[in-house]
């Protein structure tokens, strides 16, 4: 089995005097034989000499076979294989910037995440204030049941975890209750006295009459 055959490369220190190539698959030759045709074949305005690659030699031979009066030349190959020019080397790279639509979409997604996190926190606060849990009562006395708390954010809730933006304080005949948006009722036993039920039960239940006293005899013995 034969290994991969790598073609042999020929190199020139100064490079081809026409295209500036420094390596070629063919040998470099002296340009003296072709220098007289450089001006017409490659459109040069100066004299060039030195090594010339086989590709440029073939272009000179092709130019010689052109019909008389032809103005065709291969000026485009002059210095075509030279190293990168100073202009190309110093050309700044374009910095990719985010388009307006992409920036706007990133801002919207960020706001949506903040909104979802805020709603999650509010939901957890409301769940902690649910009547199903055992509330932690404050040490407020019964004497303060008829005192209305200040409105707005300055009023202090009865429960430390009570969210007054959800629970609305209402005063009824039996005391103070807190009513939610969906009809839930939160009661503090320190501020609630079931007077209504007691009065109703007392009105429905007839008064029990005691046993009649025995008549006292006035007869003298």
Curated annotation (Swiss-Prot):
GO terms for cellular component: nucleus; Sin3-type complex. Residues 112-152, 201-221 are annotated as: Disordered. One of its GO terms (biological process) is positive regulation of stem cell population maintenance. It holds the Pfam family FAM60A. Keywords: Nucleus. Induction: Peaks during G1 and S phases of the cell cycle in U2OS cells. Up-regulated in squamous cell carcinoma (SCC), adenocarcinoma (AC), colon, ovary, rectum and stomach tumors. This is SIN3-HDAC complex-associated factor. It comes from Homo sapiens (Human). The gene is SINHCAF.
């Amino acid at each position: 089995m034969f290994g991969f055959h790598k073609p042999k490369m020929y190199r020139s220190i100064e490079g081809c005097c026409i295209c500036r190539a420094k390596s070629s698959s063919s040998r470099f030759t002296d340009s003296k034989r072709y220098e007289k045709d450089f001006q017409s074949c490659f459109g040069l305005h100066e004299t060039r000499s030195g090594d010339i690659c086989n590709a440029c030699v073939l272009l000179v031979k092709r130019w010689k076979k052109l019909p008389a009066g032809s103005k065709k030349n291969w000026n485009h190959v002059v210095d075509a294989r030279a190293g990168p020019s100073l202009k190309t080397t110093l050309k700044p790279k374009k910095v990719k910037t985010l388009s307006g639509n992409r920036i706007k979409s990133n801002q919207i997604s960020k706001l949506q995440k903040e909104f979802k996190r805020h709603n999650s926190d509010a939901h957890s606060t409301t769940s902690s204030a649910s009547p199903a849990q055992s509330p932690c009562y404050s040490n407020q006395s019964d004497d303060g049941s008829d005192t209305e708390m200040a409105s707005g954010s300055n009023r202090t809730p009865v429960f430390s975890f009570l969210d007054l933006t959800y629970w609305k304080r209402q005063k009824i005949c039996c005391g103070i209750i807190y009513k939610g948006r969906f009809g839930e009722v939160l009661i503090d036993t320190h501020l609630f006295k079931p007077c209504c039920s007691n009065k109703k039960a007392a009105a429905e239940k007839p008064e029990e009459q005691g046993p009649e006293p025995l008549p006292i005899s006035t007869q003298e013995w």
